[in-house]
UniProtKB/Swiss-Prot annotation, chain A:
Residues 1-109, 349-372 are annotated as: Disordered. This is Origin of replication complex subunit 1B. It comes from Arabidopsis thaliana. Zn(2+) 2 binds at C169, C172, H191, C194. Residues 163-187, 203-207, 319-324 are annotated as: Histone H3 binding.
From Swiss-Prot, chain B:
It comes from the Eukaryota. Gene3D superfamilies: P-loop containing nucleotide triphosphate hydrolases. It comes from Arabidopsis thaliana (Mouse-ear cress). Component of the origin recognition complex (ORC) composed of at least ORC1 (ORC1A or ORC1B), ORC2, ORC3, ORC4, ORC5 and ORC6. ORC is regulated in a cell-cycle and development dependent manner. It is sequentially assembled at the exit from anaphase of mitosis and disassembled as cells enter S phase. Interacts directly with ORC1A, ORC2, ORC3, ORC5 and ORC6. Follow a cell-cycle regulation with a peak at the G1/S-phase. Isoform AtORC4a is expressed at low levels ubiquitously. Isoform AtORC4b is mostly expressed in siliques, flowers and flower buds, and, to a lower exent, in roots, leaves and stems. This is Origin of replication complex subunit 4. GO terms for molecular function: ATP binding; ATP hydrolysis activity; DNA replication origin binding. The gene is ORC4. GO terms for cellular component: nuclear origin of replication recognition complex. It is found in: Nucleus. Induction: Regulated by E2F. Accumulates rapidly after cell cycle reactivation by sucrose addition following cell cycle arrest mediated by sucrose deprivation. Signal peptide: none annotated.
Amino acid sequence: MASTPRAKTFKSPTKTPSNIYRKSYLSPSSTSHTPQTPETHTPLRRSARHVSRKIDLGNDPIDAPGNDPIEGMNLIRKRERAPRKPTTDVVPSKSKKTETPKKKKKIDSFTPVSPIRSETIKKTKKKKRVYYNKVEFDETEFEIGDDVYVKRREDSNSDEEEDPEIEDCQICFKSDTNIMIECDDCLGGFHLKCLKPPLKEVPEGDWICQFCEVKKSGQSQTLDLPKPPEGKKLARTMREKLLSGDLWAARIDKLWKEVDDGVYWIRARWYMIPEETVSGRQPHNLKRELYLTNDFADIEMECILRHCSVKCPKEFSKASNDGDDVFLCEYEYDVHWRSFKRLAELADGDSDSDQEWNGRKEEEVDDSDEEMELDDEVLKSKRGGLTSARGGANSRKGRFFGVEKVGMKLIPEHVRCHKQSELEKAKATLLLATRPKSLPCRSKEMEEITSFIKGSISDDQCLGRCMYIHGVPGTGKTISVLSVMKNLKAEVEEGSVSPYCFVEINGLKLASPENIYSVIYEALSGHRVGWKKALQCLNERFAEGKRIGKEDEKPCILLIDELDLLVTRNQSVLYNILDWPTKPNSKLVVLGIANTMDLPEKLLPRISSRMGIQRLCFGPYNHTQLQEIISTRLNGIDAFEKTAIEFASRKVAAISGDARRALEICRRAAEVADHRLNTNKSAKNQLVIMADVEAAIQEMFQAPHIQVMKSVSKLSKIFLTAMVHELYKTGMAETTFDRVATTVSSICLTNGEAFPGWDILLKIGCDLGECRIILCEPGEKHRLQKLQLNFPSDDVAFALKDNKDLPWLANYL
Amino acid sequence: MGKETPAEKSLNLIRGRLCDPSYVFRPLSASSDSNYSKLKFIVSTSITEGCNNSMLLLGPRGSGKAAVLDLGVGDLLEQFPDSVSVIRLNGLLHSDDNCAFKEIAKQLCMEHHLLFSKMASFDDNSQFIIAMLRACGLAHKTIIFVLDEFDMFAQGKQRLLYSLLDAMQSVTSQAVVVGISSRLDADQLLEKRVRSRFSHRKFLFLPPSREELDGLFVHLLSLPADSGFPSGYVSRFNDKIKNLTSDTRFKDILKTLFNANSTVNSFLKFIFCAVSLMNLESGLLSLENFKAALSSMQRQPKLEAVRDCSVLELYLLVCMRRLEVKEQSSYNFISVMKEYKAIHDSFHTSDYYAQNVCLRAFEHLRERQVICYAENRGQSQTGEYRLQKLLISASELHQGMRSHACCPAILLKLLDH
């Protein structure tokens, strides 16, 4: 969760600031003193500023006199200025004017001056470091993962004292307690009452000021912004400096302190404004948008100015009162390949469970050799691309060289600017890849799995146990287990459950059943070995109780999906995996998932006895459950009629009870409705109706052979009729081409059709066999070819009975 | 050698059209209800909305499944040049799972200019594919997997199908899996786990109607007026085509053709034959060209084999037929020779040959596949002792002998009794 940035102005020391910075660069061994408060300030003034800032950080609207808080405001990409208490503290203006530096758009010049020097210094000396997760520096707490403003040059310190946290109104040039609104185009702040006409409330949705509105309409007459009164300099906030290229933003990747000189450093991951990319600012870029790059640098903490807040799109939409230092970051920019990728949301990805148990340590002493090696790698990747000596992109699992090349040169416009309709939202939420927030209709089963696992790994006596979970496809077996494991992980973080390691394996994704040993061993130890070596190591661990590291003391939960594919001829793989939990001190819990109910009975007796009696059956969903599953996903989206959902639920429940099938039918119905509404744009009803669900069901469950039989050529129909006739005459399903041809000949003779010839008739039969309407032997057998209907003869009769061209076919069917 | 005549230029133009699937199927796909529109809509939805889809194209061979898909994917590649990459697999080549995964990784590397390693194992390739799907999904790129001969992938353990469809439901990716098969029961072949993950969007490709085929005929054979042809020739050629379509005899020719096979591919072959027989002097298509094309489309190779037999071979065929009539379902050369000798003794025919001459004629019949060995076992035996079977029927033999030029009359009499 991104918190409100704790802002504090960097106070000027007694000495000239440039002297201190130059001194620290030239001789890093010298100790940097904490800057002192200037003595020229009176105590009353300092106290007033401190009190004022404290109140401002709270953003408490109750303290604002005469302003009632606006309740229930639904602000989209709107940042309202919270009312602030007036301050009598006036910063004296500087007589010198700072020249605005030119924008540097080239990537080569992106690297700031400070990190180059620090890297040069760091390369020459290997030093001990103390790593931190959290550091308090200049009375401000900085943490790994925070976003901060970073100075661009040394002499930019002169602007520092002028940094106001409160933006001035663009019209009256005052900052007071009144509510302000921000223009979405120029990002300027305006008082509500200063506008013409004045606004009484903050409007919903996007808002553009009158100056930008005139500019956008393309009128020849330009409405100029009012100019500030004489003597008052227009103060720029840090946000404005960042977006105009005078500052940098970075994310803190690492925090450490040099042991020798006590200097604090961070590893910064840079953000970029759109102007600095090769593509420049694209039409769909928002004003407050940044890109996260893969460019890193080590900088001293003194270069950090203060916090800012970079948010993902969802959080950005909700950020309405977070102040001026809020930015949007949705894409990652690769500075080497100049391509964009969407940032993978952290909620989707499952972090490695081993790293979670380490927890957060206050400090950690690490050797700098490893750090130097990492720096070399970063520097190497900066200089050039990949070399062929590294091997192919697919040559090593888990490390794919060049995958970062896959990226868009330009972010497509339809992705950013397109506003989703209700149907598109429904389609997105009905995807099988979309993870619902809750898992309906499986609470009882999840409780049973939870109690099984908790009972197995509770306290220090870990019992080795097995559980077999079965059910037909699409009933939520795997997703229930994964959901239980996710909940357990949350409980481990809270501390109510002891740590464990979790391995998930799918039997259908293994190259061979024996490969499961390698996969398990790699998941537990991180080493890649052949399966025989892995089997030996796993035997040592589970059967003989040998353990190497501290990690091996934790219980191991093994989830094997598609368990029935591990059955080999002698079933040794299953035997080993199910035998390990029965050993003392193995601390292994096995969860097996398959579709068949009677898999244990099919196995050898010594394997089924080790599988135990712990069974869990996932029955097919009934129509009420399917309806609840679909309605839960469509919660808040008004795209489906209620009868349409019920119709789809009942249809799938009658056939298979497969949740995947139900979701796919609803999604296909939404697609059919979307296609229908695209072709017929004057339709008033925008919902998915029952006819769309019927069309989707018709397509998914249709019998294509009947339609094909209705549309085959005339002689093919006669051929099929002859086959049905032969079936009725002889009573045997199988017949030969000789008999069929004789029957066709007599049928054609009787009804006045021209007999095509035996070779043409043979080809017609082979074509029908290719469609699998009939089953036939290869055509080279000619007269002796064996033929058989692949579908029931009633289907053939149904398809051919009402033929218009050949009405006499009904006599033979 | 002089300049190319207008007849030759028009011939080349029409042949080029017939060999271009997009030219053939573009007018057939104009309707909004056509498979082309539905296909394109689903794939473009995957591109614009960032979702996964899977579908199955079913239809008889020659009905335009792959051609219509190529048409739709080609249009989308023009519309979204950076957002689409196509991976093509064929069941006849890549039905083995290891081979298929390697081929997918190879094509992914080629599409995105990565370095491909042939030494990668199954695990490496499958993990690489999942990583690429994730990376392409984050980059708003759609990968279209075209699985031709889909039923060949549905044999064995179906690891490829399971991995692709499972990756599409658990990874944030944008992928479309398109299966193409001429087997109408291809979705029944799927294993239950794969069937549950498959979306069962099935598009059926049926032969077009007569009106559509007539329109296609005019579309394929009309010369454009703004080309380099002489204007008089163009109008004469197009008038000839128009007269042909309204001719009753031409309609009968088409009717006979469509009675046997009404797919687009068969129609194209027919037109290609007719165009190839065009008279280069007049430069116009005539009814005789289409008649000759129909004759070549409706050949009967077994009947022609019987018609081209020698008299001795006919005697042997009649002897085999007589043995079958006597309920002797299996025979070898020795049995046939006995029957041949009996016929000679009974009817005192003048055409009697020695045994080694008859053996050579017998082997000649087997080479032309008029007869074949009854079983594959016992290959160590000499040719004259192995059991044989007659492949043509009695009516075919009768018809062939009647159309034979110098068939003795005694053979027809022998065949009837």
